[in-house]
Amino acid sequence: MKNRKYIIRVVGILTVGLLLVKMTYQFKYSTFIFDLIFFSGLVIIGLVFLIWSLFSDLKHFRAEKKIISLIPIGIAIVFTTTIWVWNTQINSNFDKPTLVRIFYDGGFNGTGIDFKKDGTYIIDNSAIGLSDFIYGTYEINGNRIILDKKALENVVVTNQLEIRPKIIEYSDRTETDNIVYQIDEEGNVIKNSTEFRLVIDNRE
């Protein structure tokens, strides 16, 4: 019976740990609300296996002095460390200081591009409960932004963007807003391309 429970703990920790590691890696590129709920459930199950292992396997190790008794705990520590490191790296990308942030609101979906001060960017292509992320690098010269990719997710159709003022007329007033346009090599706005609002501008 003791060996059977030990095998259950090892298999359980391996299964839950591998699933959590896989999902943590996938969260760098995509998040879905039901995946987050499933991830939270796996964390709870993993904690149950870990607590069970801490009480049972440490007790057996003290009594038998066999290193094999600590294998489940060791596996759990490896998985926990891996998940923590990857999660820290993912969050560090999002936490970098923003230079410019632009956004397109499509109603039920939207696309935001966060241009970081270190020359990297993150595209967040979102819909209800779902976000897909794309990473890349860029260069900025005045109001022109040059991306490392020619096209991105059927939203950005060029590698050149430009910040330009746009006069917006309302029934009772007229305002000037900064819009980010997609342009070609000659600087012409590409017809029917998505326009972005400039929501954060930390340029000096």
Regions found by a protein language model. Give the residues of each.
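Lipid interaction determinants
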Residues: 2-117, 122-134, 141, 148-204
